[in-house]
Amino acid sequence: LTRALEIYIAEFVGGIIVSKRSTDIENLNPDHVLSFNYSDTYEKIYGKEKKIKYDYIHGKANINKNVKTSNLVLGIDEYLNDERKDSELEFLVFKKFYQRVYKSTDNDYLNWIDRISDEYANYIENKNNMLESYRNSHNSVMKHIYLVSAKEKIPKHNLYIFGHSLDITDRDVLRLFI
């Protein structure tokens, strides 16, 4: 069934010619795209000639794959409470988290999150150092330099979500970004 969906997406959806574009999306210049979709629609329509890193977290439809090599993830949410989820494993293979691991879908997004966290930690550390230097300085010119440096803005990372149902089955990934 999953392979049939993959063929449909790769052949039919992939063959649709798009004549209209959203200028709102077109004017974005992302460095990274985390796709929960199986098709490369965004990449084909908006990502041409841009240096964007893509991560297809639920796999990417590919006509050249087969039943064994297909990495599309179709799954359910963890619906059991904490006591039962580790002991009742009969539906484990249907859960999205398990399938993402088992099918080795992309997880580059974890590196992206680490980089954002590191940038923020460095920003905070630099701010603390500047403020400490400001407090300890007796030279008014240096105090001014430290104060101006302390006003440096926090690194900005924008998150745009489109084409996603925001279903609870993907909350583990979305929570990392939000």
Role assignments for model-derived ranges:
Residues 1-139:
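Extended, H/D-rich, highly charged conserved domains that either
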Residues 29, 50-51, 144-178:
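SIR2/sirtuin-family catalytic core signature
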